[in-house]
Amino acid sequence: MFGYSMVQMVRANAHKLDWPLRETVLQLYKPFKWTPCFLHKFFETKLQNRKKMSVIIEFEEGCHETGFQMAGEVLQKEKRSKLKSRFNKINCCSAEVTPSALHSLLSECSNIRKVYLNREVKALLDTATEASHAKEVVRNGQTLTGKGVTVAVVDTGIYPHPDLEGRIIGFADMVNQKTEPYDDNGHGTHCAGDVASSGASSSGQYRGPAPEANLIGVKVLNKQGSGTLADIIEGVEWCIQYNEDNPDEPIDIMSMSLGGDALRYDHEQEDPLVRAVEEAWSAGIVVCVAAGNSGPDSQTIASPGVSEKVITVGALDDNNTASSDDDTVASFSSRGPTVYGKEKPDILAPGVNIISLRSPNSYIDKLQKSSRVGSQYFTMSGTSMATPICAGIAALILQQNPDLTPDEVKELLKNGTDKWKDEDPNIYGAGAVNAENSVPGQ
């Protein structure tokens, strides 16, 4: 197999190709491992020009403009290959390439630092308000509701549910490029309700911790609840750009109930998705990310939850009671340490049998009819549900003090938790989120 030129290229450029991309290219050649040498050229020519891969290209620091231009010129000469989206914040772009085009890029573009396979990312789906002590948080005689705070739900979209009436103030669609809010999967709508449902359709019974917060739907996952690294990065960069364009009414919080397997790079910042969320954090956006649903094994924290900066949220099973006495960590909730040996998750929030908003006729709504609660609500479990609940409590903190930095919000959330004495922080994090204890003041 080593006689094939592309296999030799992979070996020579292993430091510039991430592991999934190396494996993808090599897998193309496995069926031809025992092919006679005189047929190698024939089969390789077919492979090089017919197979197509979606990739993310990272350029050397300070070379984004030049690198993007050079890559575009190379791909113009290649069949079935093209540049797609630019990610200026993280010095990358996405592209579709054949093996032949990949070879040309690595040979002719000296500004390329690394090329990543554009891997799949999925929605992390496997009483909540009361259990997190967010039913009524009063400061200075005012009940905090998240009013004036904007949360971007980076997910499958948001259905304009009656419990969100008048508060979906923006929508961006990286999947189908639609302009009006919708959710063909249902996961994003449930998460939006976990943040900010008013409970209007249930006389307040099923309301989120921030029932007056504004929402922006950023659709990065498709009808089946999956997307790609490029889709997610594009959504995150859209949020950063939104704030640059709207400095007086910015996105304060991003809730991301999604993730993919965390690969072991030299350090977590080599992960393009980690770099994207850390750019958002540095731009002043509080980022809440799901830990993942691959527990109870250790080292199962998903990406981008492996980022040291962001708030990584695990799932608590509150056993459908407001008391914390019977709370346990959900068996499915991913555990640390991360693949980089860092402690995670940061915090736990309710994530089992959470009742929130239903998106009628969506993919999940049709698939799990037994999970419907009346005509307006739906039950789901997962760190996907815990994450927006934590984001909703962060909204209360920012309503009380809008000038706090993301680091300060994270510290308040961790310091305000209900703690388990002498428990492993790689399972329990800092403890269970507690709105009453986390919001400063009396």
UniProtKB/Swiss-Prot annotation:
Is completely inhibited by phenylmethanesulphonylfluoride (PMSF) in vitro. PROSITE patterns: SUBTILASE, SUBTILASE_ASP, SUBTILASE_HIS, SUBTILASE_SER. Induction: Is expressed during the late stationary phase of growth. Is down-regulated by SinR. Its main location: cytoplasm. It is found in: Cytoplasm. It comes from the Bacteria. Belongs to the peptidase S8 family. Displays serine protease activity. Seems to have a broad substrate specificity. SUPFAM superfamilies: Subtilisin-like. This is Serine protease AprX. Disruption phenotype: Cells lacking this gene show normal growth and sporulation.
